[in-house]
């Protein structure tokens, strides 16, 4: 039975290039999930966009002496160029700088305001006398009162993940000049989160299928009690407040950016010439998934659901499969200290599927995982090249050489051959279950295990020997190995779309795997084939030293 799936993916700040931490945290798992569901025949809408209004953008603009718009547009263009290289298959990738997004965000604000879920109040906000301005939360840094991390920001501690207010920080200082700010009164608008505490708690308690880290974090946060949060800031960059008399205020980015999931859906529908089409992905029997990093958990399991509850008429998240962090050579990714692997740079030297494979096999689903160049080389050479790639190359090459570039006639199959076909079908069934539950590491491990089993079958049958004495027996063995490869092209497709599409073409099916469905499609005897090229390339051991030296490790 087909499903309708909405996939919202975290919006990257348009203030820096994409690095592998971003990819492993949200974008790759979302793409795997989308490709899997499309192959199953499900309706899928996957959206995201560049967050153009965050304070990281204004901070970078001030550092470079240019406007925030110039910074945001520069990195938005870079993101747009990077996604195809990564194989990320968006249905709509946009930005928060569109008129459609501003309109949608303002409509959400007004809806909540008119229903009494947004109110205004006079509060004390950090003001830097030296810079002569109010400081947005990310312009304030200090020590986290909860975990004592010294690099906490005025909106959140990246170490323990807890949202913060600037006044809670210990030893706080202005990020721009380093001087301690003072607090002055200013009027702001607040989201009445406290009004949703009971409803949110009951809702979250039903999410027993959520990842343990996501569920526990959310329940722990709810038990501490929800505090109303300011949703406006004294800025000149961002979505204007849709009320007269407040021209100097903008919607706070954490409130505004999550509305992008809705505005992107509306933009997608308009681009199709069906302006109401977005509604089917936001109501009824649609399941909505939000792929994010763990620092975004409370915004997607508490704040965004509260906003949706307050507005009414829109689906709440079905699942929020947040990932933990990806470290690099046992160190946390850090853009400021150049401890990062930049997407465009690494893809200039290595194939996208090699990169996607390692990130999938080491995906930080329930705990932090490490990216190691030694592991990168080992998995590429031992698993992609020697196991999966070698299986495809020797089977397809033998078929093309000995059977006139056609899928061989296979006759009656013996028990061992039938057993491999059964195992291939079982693998597709098990990977389907794993992917449906967002267990990506388990799914790719199952696929590689089947490749290992197919290699054992091939070694037992030894068609290179059979061909010399019994061509019909060799034909049967090679045909069954091709059937296993047919299953593997499907199972690996969400993870490794480029090589899977090539393998599908070599098998005689054509490159569009999604049209075939999540089933074992048997090769057609007599089908014309083309001689294969290797799916993957071996990497030299010197890569480890070269790449660690490039990063100064």
Curated annotation (Swiss-Prot):
Subunit structure and binding partners: Monomer.
Position of the signal peptide: none
Motif ('KMSKS' region): 332-336
Gene: metG
Enzyme Commission (EC) number: 6.1.1.10
Job of this protein: Is required not only for elongation of protein synthesis but also for the initiation of all mRNA translation through initiator tRNA(fMet) aminoacylation.
Main location: cytoplasm
Binding site for Zn(2+): 144, 147, 157, 160
Gene3D superfamilies: HUPs, Isoleucyl-tRNA Synthetase, Domain 1, Methionyl-tRNA synthetase, Zn-domain
Binding note for cofactor: Binds 1 zinc ion per subunit.
Superkingdom of source: Bacteria
UniProt similarity note: Belongs to the class-I aminoacyl-tRNA synthetase family. MetG type 1 subfamily.
CDD domains registered for this protein in UniProt: Anticodon_Ia_Met (cd07957), MetRS_core (cd00814)
One of the GO biological process terms: methionyl-tRNA aminoacylation
Protein name: Methionine--tRNA ligase
Record's subcellular location: Cytoplasm
Gene Ontology CC terms, in alphabetical order: cytosol
Cofactor(s) this protein cannot do without: Zn(2+)
Catalytic reaction list: tRNA(Met) + L-methionine + ATP = L-methionyl-tRNA(Met) + AMP + diphosphate
Entry binding sites for ATP: 335
GO molecular function: ATP binding; metal ion binding; methionine-tRNA ligase activity
PANTHER family attached to this UniProt entry: METHIONINE--TRNA LIGASE, METHIONINE--TRNA LIGASE, CYTOPLASMIC
Entry keyword set: Aminoacyl-tRNA synthetase, ATP-binding, Cytoplasm, Ligase, Metal-binding, Nucleotide-binding, Protein biosynthesis, Zinc
SUPFAM superfamilies membership: Anticodon-binding domain of a subclass of class I aminoacyl-tRNA synthetases, Methionyl-tRNA synthetase (MetRS), Zn-domain, Nucleotidylyl transferase
Enzyme class per UniProt: ligase
